[in-house]
A protein has these predicted regions:
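Conserved PLP-enzyme active-site core in the AAT-like
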Residues: 69-72, 89-95, 117
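Generic secondary-structure signature for well-ordered alpha-helical cores
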Residues: 6, 68, 97, 119, ...
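A residue-level signal for conserved active-site and pocket-lining positions in enzyme catalytic cores
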Residues: 20, 99, 189, 211, ...
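Conserved, well-structured functional cores that handle cations and Mg-NTP chemistry
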Residues: 1-79, 84-87, 255-257
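A short alpha/beta connector and helix-capping loop motif
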Residues: 34-35, 86-104
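A short, flexible helix-boundary coil/loop motif
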Residues: 217-284
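An anionic, glycine-rich sequence signature occurring as long contiguous blocks
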Residues: 104-205
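Short amphipathic alpha-helical "interface-anchor" segments enriched in bulky aromatics
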Residues: 190, 194-229
Length: 284
């Protein structure tokens, strides 16, 4: 799959690559766990790298291999707080990419300093060319969500900014209204890249496309969690084939839904042959 992906005219520069893990629940139990870590190109909607790890705790160890498997120069790799450690962030920068990473309690002091900074900035209505806010709203299916994204490139107060490689800090304040009930959440991020508040709003939002664009399709269309094959490398190999099928459909018939494409491939030999020819380079 890696060699085939390299042959595609994909431009990863400035594209958000969502790094996320997925446990194959159908073949996982207390004695046998199949856990995968993947890089998902959110604009191209392609799985561009995949590694098997023992469990979620082992996800960080897969990062060097993932970064070496494909050229990520100029891309933006988005990661959850599980990766908020200096060695991992340095690996991303050394690969020629930028990062956006969540900051939570696993970096307690850093999280507290950032939270305090943004709290004070709002309290005094901080006005600076290096501090900007942007608000957006989504409405649908009885839900209204409003997000306020504030970005600061004024990091002179942060003593370890250089060792972290931060170029910007981001605060996202979300308010959701569902069936008359309101919930609020505040999240913080660090990034090696500088950008506008509107750009960071899109980049952070794009990270979650891995849920609908990859995990949902695998679970609902390909029924991955219903698969039971776990002998040897069966689970890992079958997971790779599912992702290859997704990539072929998305790369060469992007306007067609996955369910429709699978049905056509099953009942229309010409359509199946066309897809396979794109994958193997010869008419089937």
């Amino acid at each position: 799959m890696r060699n085939w992906l390299k042959s595609l005219p994909i431009n990863l520069k400035n594209q958000v690559l969502s790094l996320d893990g997925k446990r194959l629940r159908g073949v996982s139990n207390n004695e046998h766990i199949t856990h995968l870590v993947e890089l998902f190109a959110t604009e191209s909607r392609l799985v561009i790298a995949q590694e098997k790890v023992p469990d979620k705790k082992g996800e960080r160890k897969a990062l060097p291999s993932l970064l070496k498997s494909i050229d990520v120069t100029g891309a933006i790799i988005s990661m959850d707080a599980h990766y908020t450690y200096k060695p991992e962030l340095s690996q991303v920068l050394e690969a020629g990419a930028d990062y956006i990473v969540g900051i939570k309690g696993n970096q307690g002091r850093l999280h507290a300093e950032i939270e305090n900074y943004f709290t004070q900035a709002h309290a005094i209505s901080y006005d600076s060319e290096e501090f900007e806010c942007y608000t957006e709203a989504d409405k649908g299916h009885g839900r209204l969500e409003t997000r306020s994204v504030c970005v600061s490139c004024d990091l002179g107060w942060l003593g370890e900014r250089e060792s972290w490689g931060f170029g910007a800090l981001i605060e996202v304040r979300s308010q959701r209204e569902i069936k008359g009930k309101t919930s609020k959440e505040v999240r913080y991020y660090g990034s090696s890249r500088k950008g506008t508040a509107k750009e960071f709003a899109r980049w952070i939002r794009d990270h979650w496309l891995v849920e609908n664009g990859l995990h949902y399709v695998l679970d609902v269309v390909f029924r991955e969690d219903d698969a039971r094959a776990n002998t040897g490398y069966a689970a890992e190999n079958l997971s790779l084939f599912r992702r290859m099928a997704m990539n072929v459909i998305k790369a060469f018939d992007p306007k067609r839904g996955f369910e429709d494409a699978r049905r056509s491939a099953a009942f229309e030999p010409a359509y199946l042959g066309g897809l396979l020819s794109k994958l193997f380079g010869a008419r089937c």
